[in-house]
Regions:
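N-terminal presequence-like segments and the immediate start of the first folded domain
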Residues: 1-260
Length: 260
């Protein structure tokens, strides 16, 4: 782990469509609807540096880190995924922020391949092998986003904490680790949401969700019905978070939703 350097002002800034500044550490190649920015403010002293092959920035409670691997450096995409998550767990433990709350995974050609050779299923298999060696106490909230083009890069961004969160299930949906075999040799490993409290307040980190009921997408071809189903899924997670918190949680000013 490289010695951290101090930074001021911003823990993380997601800049959609805005031209990257020269000093920006992490960029993701995705098309956007319009220019905007999502800014995460720090709590306490900021520092940044390197964790092996990953860059990080952290404050007194949270750390954001970014790892990029090329599948050309490994036997196949499953092995690339396994190595990414092996490093993620090693780096998180070494950093002093061992509790991984949220992960964003980006790679191209996500549905390429037939059956268990599909790239998304290969990604899940590699991730599972890494986590069998070093399980998370709680599976983090997570999203897998397909990027355009033919990139060989697997990019993993994660948010971690010095204190654990509480993983949440959605009773309207099958728990990911119990998905039936038709979704691959290894089911996906994530929680539907993660609830976390700290000195800065509380966070509800919701995984990528869709018009999913049980384990199947519904309302194929009907965008309005799909959006309504997504809203019901988010409402269900807000109820679960309220049960953990001990009082109801609603849509608050400043809540951020990303649409892919």
């Amino acid at each position: 782990m490289a010695p951290p350097r101090e930074q001021r002002g911003v823990l993380a800034q997601w800049r959609f469509g805005l031209k990257p500044r020269e000093e920006d550490h992490c960029t993701v190649d995705l098309p956007v609807f319009e220019d905007c920015a999502e800014v995460w403010r720090p709590h306490g002293r900021l520092r940044y540096g390197k964790l092996g092959g990953a860059g990080f920035i952290a404050d007194d409670e949270l750390m954001m880190a970014d790892l990029k691997l090329s599948e050309y450096d490994f036997d196949d995409f499953s092995t690339t995924s396994e190595e990414a998550y092996r490093r993620l767990t090693d780096y998180a433990r070494a950093s002093g922020y061992p509790f991984v709350l949220r992960v964003w995974n980006y790679f191209s050609r996500i549905n390429e391949g037939d059956g268990d050779d599909e790239r998304y299923r290969q990604f899940c298999s590699g991730r599972q092998r890494a986590l069998e060696r070093d399980w998370f106490d709680e599976d983090p909230a997570a999203t897998v986003i397909g990027r355009p083009g033919q990139s060989s890069r697997l990019q993993v961004i994660w948010l971690a904490s010095k204190r654990p969160g509480r993983c949440l299930d959605n009773p309207r949906q099958v728990t990911p680790k119990r998905y039936p075999r038709e979704y691959g040799i290894n089911p996906p490993r994530f929680s539907r949401a993660m609830y976390w409290e700290g000195a800065r307040g509380e966070l509800l980190l919701i995984s990528g969700t869709a018009s999913l009921v049980g384990h199947e997408s519904v309302h194929d071809g009907d965008l309005a019905a799909q959006v309504a189903e997504i809203r019901r899924n988010i409402d269900s997670l807000l109820i679960q978070a309220g049960d953990v918190r001990g009082r109801s949680i609603g849509y608050q000013t400043g809540a951020v939703f990303r649409v892919y």
